[in-house]
Amino acid sequence: RSARFSFWPFTFSRSLKKTVGRNTRQLYRDTVADLDTLWQQQQAAVPVMVVKKIAIEPPEVWTQYHYPQPLSDGSILVRKSGLADVNQLVRLWPDGREEPLRDFRPNGRFSTAANKVIWTQTRPDSRWGLQSFSDIARYDMDSGEFRYLTEKGKYFSAALSPDGSRIATVEFDASRQCRLVLLDAQSGDVLRRYRNPDNDFLQDPAWSPDGERIVLTRQKYSGKSLTVIGVDSAEKVDLFGPTDEDIRWPQFYRNYILYNSPLTGNDAIWAIDMTSLKRFLLVSRPLGAYYPLPIPDQDILYLSDYESMGLRVARTELEPDAWIPASTVESRPLDYFAPIVTQEAPPDWETFEENAFDDYAVTDYHPDRQDWQLHSWWIKPELPILSAGFTVNNLTNTIAWEASSDYRVNEKTRAYHLDLSYAGLDPIFDLSIRTGERAAQYFDVTEADKVWDRWHENSISLTSRVVRNRIWDTYSGFHSFEIGAGYTQLQGKTHDSIGDLRNGTMLPLSLRFRWMRYRQGAYRDLYPKDGQVVDLYGDMAIPGYENEGRHLALRGIQYFPGLGRHHNLGAEIAGEWHASAGYNYRFASALPFVKGYEYFDFERMLRVGLFYAFPIAYPDWALGPFLYAKRLRAEVFYNHAALRVDSQNLPLRAVGLDLNLDYHLLSIPQISFGSGIRIAYRHAEKDIHIQLLFFGFTL
């Protein structure tokens, strides 16, 4: 019942309250209190070992240090990430100093050997948005060289051999076949694919110090197994399993395999003797210990220890005689799900499993028999247009319907769209039906008077669109080119100051080009640290109909890092031209207007601008489930524009400050709203002008 009205705020919470007497917030608090009690009882029965943490400056926000891997110079290479940090390769020195090496975009872990670092990285298909690849990237710490070893691969969990010459990785191809693969670490060529006849799901391969064996986990329906494979012989030896333990990150140490397991109910580091198959508890920590990496010749274990503010790097001595035999350790998993299983269990599991599921006939897919999914609603603020709508797709995502409404802040008009896209070909084809208002505001330079003309437009258009995506290292790129033609009917025109504005029809042609490139950012960043955007718009009406017009606009933005953390400096240049002499139709302006001024129409505009954006505070304050105040931010700006209005030049200059509060409404995490105020000093008028802002739009 709740699912049918999922679009209505708090539907699930109200249903819970009606059914069990507790809403979502109350149920969450009850659950946390219950889990806290159970966790304390669990901790009392599990030993906690002392580890030595690498001293670092305490972070202000949640920050993670993953996958510690010691280097020959005494430093420790880690992956650092968090609310305030992008994924970085960082050297940690014993005294706590951090030396950032570079940003990177790993799918998970990384691996280092012979001063080389490798990881797998997701890269999109250039054209098909739902198709992606996972390629192996390599970074040379000596030369600083970065390159991809594979193209359009399907690899994950890559590990360098101790001598840095080979890579063991898992390949999961488009036919859902999972294999262990050896690659050449210089060329990326496949050296060997190991047979996996049962198609077990493989994870976390790791090399033995001599490079002759590989340990990994194998998962099938019956559970996980810990397996050692001979590199040359391909012989497989299961050390234990299958088990329902979520064993991860195995590593060789002498005659042992170290690994992660939640056997005690808490993630801890364990060992198994490869000869006797006896298991031992090495490291147990209050909130979990992860990513073991032993240094055999020093008998030292590096790991990540979880704290309330994230993972921290720690170390401990490896003393096998002090390890705790698994037989003496009490397994106390919380099994919080157990009451539900007991409550819902059928009286006879064997009979249930035999008859629980219907047999469905396998038939060929027919594109004409579509299963439509209403899956998303959205708000898209893209100056000067604010749009909101919802999307319906078919199962293959080749056809999409969108119904939306947009508000043009320059004209203060609203329109409604129904759009159909077909993406089964290259290019993409878009059919759009639009109905709504248009407006033009004419400015009389002599009398400084503004006159509005409003009319109604109904239009239909067909557009052909070529889209390309690209990821290279830490940069993402996107460009699109589209051309379109349409039919527009105009009604209700009354103003004729720039020609004979007639009701009637027109056949518009349009051209759009967008090019974007930007560097990955942290969650708290306001803008990219490095990024570029170029937009080109062109419109014309075919001669011979009641209305004719021409329009051209070009805009470029460059983002730079600022002086402080999460600060940005930006520069913008924009130009726009509307044909006037001999033309009686004005296309809508495609660009934001000069900050600090209310929009009016013009023949030409050239605008340059600078801005500096920075966060002020993070209130982290909530008004129940209705509003969550996330961030207060500011933006100092300067705009200088030269306009041509009624054949006269009009310079506009403004300097000012935007203050905005970023917040979430109704516990909706996907959309961050922004509201604020703009205070601008206008040079020509010698006054201070104040505007209210919503999503960056003036109200």
Protein language model regions, located:
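Outer-membrane beta-barrel initiation region
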Residues: 40-44, 48-49, 61, 261, ...
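Hydrophobic beta-strand positions that form the internal "hydrophobic ladder"
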Residues: 76-77, 117, 167, 214, ...
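Outer-membrane beta-barrel translocator/channel fold
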Residues: 290, 308, 430-480, 486-501, ...
